[in-house]
A protein has these predicted regions:
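Generic non-transmembrane alpha-helical segments
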Residues: 7-18, 92, 96-104
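Acidic-leaning, charged glycine-interspersed low-complexity segments
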Residues: 95-150
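Extracellular/virion structural assembly segments
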Residues: 65-66, 77-100
Length: 150
């Protein structure tokens, strides 16, 4: 299964109109980020893909003690000079991800639980407007009884 943050990164990179709109400036925490690519040094507009981690959620006391489903979350952060640019780029990202998911094998995609935005805000440190498009998914893993631990 492809990690959620890599799906989001690949979706953004695959959309030529979106890449043109942001001048090709995409940074992702799923790869090592050089000091030149860190958020505060990136010109506007830009996109930052963040991996927000995973957590296990067993259903009941009777659930198996071997976790087979994980809740994962990743987001696309859009930074821009104007609020309207943030809105436009968030919508472009949402469409890019939806198109990209259709190109993947069903087995490679996590189950989507929710998509939400954080809401536009002003970052006085950069300074810029920003918003986050947050994807929450469930990833299922199956184990064979004879499977060795990794």
């Amino acid at each position: 299964m492809i990690p959620l943050d890599e799906i989001l990164y690949n979706a953004v990179k695959a959309d030529s109109a979106l890449m043109e709109a942001i001048g090709g400036r995409v940074v992702s925490t799923c790869f090592e980020v050089s000091p030149e690519e860190k958020k505060d040094n990136t010109p506007l507009p830009c996109i930052i893909i963040n991996d927000d981690g995973k957590q296990a959620q067993p259903e009941t006391k009777d659930s198996t003690w071997l976790l087979t489903d994980w809740k994962v979350q990743a987001d696309i952060e859009v930074d821009a000079e104007r609020p309207k640019d943030v809105d436009r780029l968030i919508e472009m990202c949402n469409r890019a991800v939806a198109r990209y998911i259709k190109t993947l094998n069903y087995a490679d995609t996590p189950q989507l639980d929710s998509i939400q935005t954080q809401g536009k805000a002003w970052d006085w440190m950069k300074p810029c407007y920003h918003d986050r498009l947050i994807y929450s998914c469930t990833v299922y893993k199956t184990y064979n009884d004879n499977e060795q631990e990794e």
